[in-house]
């Protein structure tokens, strides 16, 4: 499991944990000795649906992220990878490529999109390669308890009822291990592969897109049919009933990465980790 791999890496001296406040990345230069090759920035406050409309919090996230770029430069990093979001795209009914127009419907999506523009400009100024991931619904062991997958697992294994929206929109999930491998692929791909690309964005998603209700029903079956779903009993989240129809051709072509874990397999692994 991921936790076992982390424990082994830590024990073998390959993983060093440095704690630092998300809002003060400049302190990292005092805590990390020597230079670094790359910086992966996944820290972002208020990513849950309830906090996505808070403009002040999202503005603070953006400021801290830009300061993190400066800290990465001070640490000697040549590549900066930022975790953007599907929320940047907004409402679409067709396949989303990295060139699809963005019209975010929440302060969260707007701030992530501003980081894509301002982060790229700052990295160019500092001489760092900027890579912007647009991640589509990652799931797996250790996920936040309020996510759809975790809420389904809690309800169905506990033989409880779960209030949901209509779940008629198209959706896409990516298992956490596949996401980690995508990040690794983008970090290890030679610099020449990125030269000439006018857009630093890479969609990172699974290869299985279908109505959200079908994913929920699959989780229900894998939980042996316990509990039940109350469709249409809950209002939609901050972005509304958004369709997720990602195109992952770019990252597959540039890095050779591809998703490996079928949704059902990922759910089984998540159940086993509980």
Where in this protein do the model-derived segments appear?
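NAD(P)-dependent short-chain dehydrogenase/reductase
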Residues: 94, 117-171, 176-187, 218-220
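Conserved Rossmann-fold NAD(P)-dependent oxidoreductase catalytic core, especially the SDR/UDP-sugar
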Residues: 38-41, 66-107
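Conserved catalytic-core motifs of eukaryotic protein kinase domains, centered on the activation segment
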Residues: 49-56, 91-96, 144
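C-terminal substrate-binding subdomain of Rossmann-fold SDR/epimerase-dehydratase oxidoreductases
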Residues: 159-274
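Conserved internal alpha-helix in NAD(P)-dependent oxidoreductase domains
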Residues: 37, 48, 55, 59-67, ...
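Active-site helix of classical SDR
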Residues: 107, 111-114
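NAD(P)H-binding glycine-rich loop region in Rossmannoid oxidoreductase-like domains
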Residues: 14-15, 19-60
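Active-site beta-alpha turn of Rossmann-fold NAD(P)-dependent dehydrogenases/reductases
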Residues: 43, 81-85, 105, 134-136, ...
């Amino acid at each position: 499991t991921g936790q076992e791999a982390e424990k082994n890496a830590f024990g073998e001296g390959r993983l060093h944990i440095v704690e630092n406040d998300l809002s003060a990345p400049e302190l990292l230069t005092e805590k990390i000795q020597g230079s670094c090759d790359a910086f992966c920035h996944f820290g972002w406050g208020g990513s849950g649906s309830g906090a996505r409309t808070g403009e002040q919090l999202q503005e603070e996230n953006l400021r801290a992220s830009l300061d993190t770029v400066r800290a990465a430069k001070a640490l000697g990093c040549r590549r900066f990878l930022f975790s953007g979001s599907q929320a940047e795209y907004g409402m679409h009914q067709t396949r989303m490529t990295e060139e699809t127009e963005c019209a975010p419907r929440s302060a969260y999506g707007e701030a992530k999109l501003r980081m894509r523009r301002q982060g790229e400009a700052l990295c160019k100024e500092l001489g760092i390669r900027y890579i912007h991931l647009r991640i589509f619904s990652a799931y797996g062991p250790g996920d936040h308890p309020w996510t759809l997958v975790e809420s389904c697992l809690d309800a169905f294994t506990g033989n409880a009822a779960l209030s949901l929206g209509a779940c008629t929109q198209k959706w896409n999930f990516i298992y956490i291990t596949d996401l980690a491998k995508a990040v690794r692929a983008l970090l290890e791909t030679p610099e020449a592969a990125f030269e000439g690309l006018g857009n630093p964005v890479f969609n990172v998603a699974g290869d299985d897109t279908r109505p959200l209700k079908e994913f929920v029903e699959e989780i229900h079956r894998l939980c042996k049919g316990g509990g039940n779903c109350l469709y249409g009993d809950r209002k939609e989240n901050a972005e509304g009933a958004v369709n997720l129809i990602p195109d992952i051709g770019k990252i597959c072509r540039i890095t050779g990465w591809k998703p490996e874990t079928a949704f059902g397999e990922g759910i089984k692994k998540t159940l086993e980790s509980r």
